[in-house]
Amino acid sequence: MANERSKLAFKKTFPVFKRFLQSKDLALVVFVIAILAIIIVPLPPFVLDFLLTISIALSVLIILIGLYIDKPTDFSAFPTLLLIVTLYRLALNVATTRMILTQGYKGPSAVSDIITAFGEFSVSGNYVIGAIIFSILVLVNLLVVTNGSTRVTEVRARFALDAMPGKQMAIDADLNSGLIDDKEAKKRRAALSQEADFYGAMDGASKFVKGDAIASIIITLINIIGGFLVGVFQRDMSLSFSASTFTILTIGDGLVGQIPALIIATATGIVATRTTQNEEEDFASKLITQLTNKSKTLVIVGAILLLFATIPGLPTFSLAFVGTLFLFIAWLISREGKDGLLTKLENYLSQKFGLDLSEKPHSSKIKPHTPTTRAKTQEELKREEEQAIDEVLKIEFLELALGYQLISLADMKQGGDLLERIRGIRKKIASDYGFLMPQIRIRDNLQLPPTHYEIKLKGIVIGEGMVMPDKFLAMNTGFVNKEIEGIPTKEPAFGMDALWIETKNKEEAIIQGYTIIDPSTVIATHTSELVKKYAEDFITKDEVKSLLERLAKDYPTIVEESKKIPTGAIRSVLQALLHEKIPIKDMLTILETITDIAPLVQNDVNILTEQVRARLSRVITNAFKSEDGRLKFLTFSTDSEQFLLNKLRENGTSKSLLLNVGELQKLIEVVSEEAMKVLQKGIAPVILIVEPNLRKALSNQMEQARIDVIVLSHAELDPNSNFEALGTIHINF
């Protein structure tokens, strides 16, 4: 009957226990409540031993996690965990103090076995030695480890916050150039925010460690003095026996608490001083590699130890053995070849003693086939010559030529990521503009200067630049606190002033507010901007066919109707849109407008384009919005706009402005001046809104004058969007 009741009780309680283990939040809450209970409730010795063991285990676990993480933010819970563990250890100090003062007179076994072991075994029962060891541990923890960890976390927190604007702009630059997508940008921004929050929290959490070390000293003094008074005045113990008993117990308690505290403080320093590691090499491997990287240093250490071994009075054997070991390791490292240290040792033992220690694969009895060579026939030689000529005559649609020092940027085996960034450009262009740019042919060109590159469209150079593959480009975007040294240059995509800086100065440049760009990104960004500039050239008839085929999968009827319209007319409309930076992503609206209007206007491209633009009002408005979601624009005064309307002249279906030299000069000067004022406010691009009849003619005039202004008409604005008028342009013609 009793067994059945036990089984029934177990059956009822086990699901509750299982849910408790599975609920991480509940387990943490119970742990914190248990810490508070430890402070209030007296504990028996075996429970106290159990809790002290957990304290030691937690400290070892934390320092091991700190050694194995790749970067500090992988242990983002560390600051909070540090607070909880510190509170737990202080609660144990209260519990052990209560136990020592109330039960210490009965003997060490009545308090705690762990405290007794540390008080008697670790210091041989000598409370003077124990006090000295405890003092050393406290001083090392407080003055060395804790102070260093606190200072490091303060500096890392300040540097992380100072570098945030530069890193944020670098993310925005990668996003704008198509190197990353929105998802990756959000991921990087979240990581950046997490890093700043982590170091900010670490700055405060490090103070817990320092306070814990100070509290340990005070608690130890209280235990010794309080225990002595309790033993003499309340328990009638002799002065010497009371001092010996309570001092040993207190020193044991101090060591049990101070060793985990020292480990936690060391873990804090390790986490705070860790940098991001190479994914292919962990911290321990990298540490050993760097320590044994130069055989010369090991030789010097070995020679110094051997020299010390010859000095009378010093331990000859120990010094000579360690010195010889250093020389042997240095000799192994200095041997030729790229094998690791263990492989070199294995090869040495194999050669020295005739041992075969390597793991060799089973040899095959089948001999490899050796191909025979023969003379090529005349037909084969002729065919190869024709193929070579065809290769020379072939014109690549889009080509990137690199100087020989830049080839490594496109070689993935050498760590180059230019190909990956070019692929990112294609995705970004397709996402933003609605067409798929052709593959970029990347080739080396020995005729170029070593660090130069050229971007060609149909064999014609449309852009060129220079990058230094072993340096970084630092750009001052207006947030620089202090200028740094570097080689002055011009950023090729936008013509901004920049500096080429050494790799070792990268972190300093970020801290000072520079936007840092690697060489591959410089080339990729330049390529991206040129593709946007010449976007209309990529709309071939084949590309139009591909766009229609993709649209036909979802909207076959409209594509079937569009077959009545000449492909050339559709292509011309798409090119006209891209020429003025209007995306063609909404092919459905574009094609519907063309099929509706084309029969009425005899496929006139100018009229079709303006009608399509009016239908794309939401797309156009969204394309030129500022970051705050507003379309910010300039307008002409009523009399200025009316004057320009009166100057319109029709040439068939197109219109142009018929202005004399003076009128044209005034128009260009005033618009340029107003556009510059807008750009100086950090607003780009500059939008100018005019009457629909005036838009195309004025846009052509601005393009001829090379004024970077987007001219829109009132008909192309989405009425549901937010707008902000920046000013009115008045021209005294």
Curated annotation (Swiss-Prot):
Extract the InterPro entries matched here.
FHIPEP_1 (IPR042194), FHIPEP_3 (IPR042193), FHIPEP_4 (IPR042196), FHIPEP_CS (IPR025505), FlhA (IPR006301), T3SS_FHIPEP (IPR001712)
The protein's UniProt keywords, in alphabetical order, are: Bacterial flagellum biogenesis, Bacterial flagellum protein export, Cell membrane, Membrane, Protein transport, Transmembrane, Transmembrane helix, Transport
Q: Which Gene3D superfamilies match?
A: FHIPEP family, domain 1 (3.40.30.60), FHIPEP family, domain 3 (1.10.8.540), FHIPEP family, domain 4 (3.40.50.12790)
Which sequence ranges are marked TM in the entry? 28-48, 49-69, 125-145, 213-233, 246-266, 291-311, 313-333
Give the PROSITE patterns listed for this entry: FHIPEP
> What are the BP-aspect GO terms?
bacterial-type flagellum assembly; protein secretion
Major localization class: membrane
Q: Does the keyword Oxidoreductase apply?
A: no
Keyword RNA-binding assigned to the entry: answer is no
Question: Per UniProt, what is the membrane topology?
Answer: Multi-pass membrane protein
* Organism domain of life: Bacteria
Q: What's in the GO CC field?
A: plasma membrane
- Compartment list: Cell membrane
Tell me, in a sentence or two, what this protein's role is: Involved in the export of flagellum proteins.
Q: What protein name does the entry list? A: Flagellar biosynthesis protein FlhA
Question: Which organism does this sequence originate in?
Answer: Helicobacter pylori (strain ATCC 700392 / 26695) (Campylobacter pylori)
Q: Which gene encodes it?
A: flhA
